[in-house]
Amino acid sequence: MKNSETIKKLGLVFPPAPKPLGVYLPTLVVDRFLYVSGHGPLKNDGSLIKGKVGSELDREEGKAAARQVGLTMLSTIINNYGNIDNIKRVVKVLGMVNATP
């Protein structure tokens, strides 16, 4: 199944992709690799999910925020390259969560 078909089947709704700002570029292509810059947890209305998991956010809210980061990254790829089906595989993901120890 193509990536675009999976997205359609899951009924995913994407938040707006971040725009380039100053030296920040949401994506960069080097050779045949697409590098996706750091993204924050954006709601579908474009506002930012704020708070620290364990104090301001509970576990489920933290999980939802992490999901939004992934959706925002997919939104960036789709908005910048139009076709998610060209992505063959993910090589590396660096994920960070603002959480209490």
Can you say where each PLM-predicted feature lies in the sequence?
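Short, polar/acidic, helix-capping and beta-turn segments at strand->helix junctions
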Residues: 1-101
